[in-house]
């Protein structure tokens, strides 16, 4: 692929996600990602930092049922390496058919991987699961609180929720916050400083860190992101 593929992705980013109020969120997502689906992973490898670190830290054991909400192309499952083969089942859930086509092709030979077209705020497996994670998905979900609540409802007591995503860290100056909100918002990414606080209020925190990573073709800007791993409380009537 190379530079030509990058240019296709950059062109989509420059155009941005449309704001057609007569379209659903799922329709806007499909229109935005379909033209760049084939080159999606190559570009995002240099933009979506911390995914491998998050998955390496998830305490998934053989026989576990894993769910990724907002899975896109299913690239993140490969970060599990040998652990994936020993999982009882891994569900990939996304709203975008174009990205899920890539996921289908990538994991067609894995009998324990299932791909679902679905909403992260509503998808629910029949039985409780051991681990749920979001990788750069919460910031794309309008009702991200509902997505987190849904993840908690599908988790077993003591189960693990992991998140890696862009955010606005505490203490960031207002001009920088305004620029990043506008720049990311052009492509449908809703930057917030509320995700970590919401997560810590609802789970027992196992680990939390904030970092910054480079953005392709923008050498002077480093995007802030966070990694969170939490454990569902064993006795919580709200969950």
Where are these regions (language model features)?
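C-terminal lobe and adjacent flexible extensions of AdoMet/dcAdoMet transferase-like proteins
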Residues: 228-239
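C-terminal alpha-helical "lid/dimerization" subdomain adjacent to the S-adenosyl-L-methionine
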Residues: 20-23, 27, 43, 162-221
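A short SAM/SAH-binding and catalytic strip from SAM-dependent methyltransferases
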Residues: 131-143
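A short glycine-rich, Lys/Arg-flanked "PGG" loop and its adjoining helix->strand segment in the class I
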Residues: 145-157
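Helix-to-beta-strand junctions that scaffold the AdoMet/dcAdoMet cofactor pocket
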Residues: 85, 141-142, 155-156
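Conserved class I S-adenosyl-L-methionine
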Residues: 2-60, 75-79, 175-179
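A short acidic, Gly/Pro-enriched loop at the edge of an enzyme's catalytic core
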Residues: 121-132
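Class I SAM-dependent methyltransferase SAM/SAH-binding core
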Residues: 65-122
């Amino acid at each position: 692929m190379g530079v030509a593929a990058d240019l296709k992705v950059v062109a989509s980013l420059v155009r941005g996600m449309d704001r057609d109020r007569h379209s659903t969120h799922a329709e806007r997502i499909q229109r935005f990602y379909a033209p760049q689906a084939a080159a999606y992973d190559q570009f995002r490898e240099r933009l979506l930092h911390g995914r491998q670190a998050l998955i390496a830290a998830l305490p998934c054991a053989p026989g576990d049922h894993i769910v990724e909400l907002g899975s896109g192309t299913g690239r993140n499952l490969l970060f599990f390496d040998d652990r994936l083969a020993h999982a009882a089942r891994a569900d990939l859930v996304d709203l975008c058919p174009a990205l899920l086509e890539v996921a289908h092709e990538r994991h067609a030979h894995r009998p324990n991987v299932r791909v679902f077209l679905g909403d992260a705020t509503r998808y629910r497996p029949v039985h409780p699961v051991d681990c749920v994670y979001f990788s750069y998905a919460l910031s794309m979900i309008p009702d991200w609180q509902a997505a987190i609540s849904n993840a908690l409802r599908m988790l077993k007591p003591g189960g693990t929720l992991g998140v890696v995503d862009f955010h606005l860290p505490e203490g960031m100056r207002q001009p920088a916050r305004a620029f990043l909100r506008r720049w990311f918002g052009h492509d449908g990414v809703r930057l917030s400083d509320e995700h970590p606080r919401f997560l810590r209020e609802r789970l027992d925190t196992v680990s939390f860190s904030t970092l910054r990573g480079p953005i392709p073709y923008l050498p002077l800007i480093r995007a802030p992101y966070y990694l969170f791993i939490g454990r569902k409380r064993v006795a919580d009537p709200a969950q």
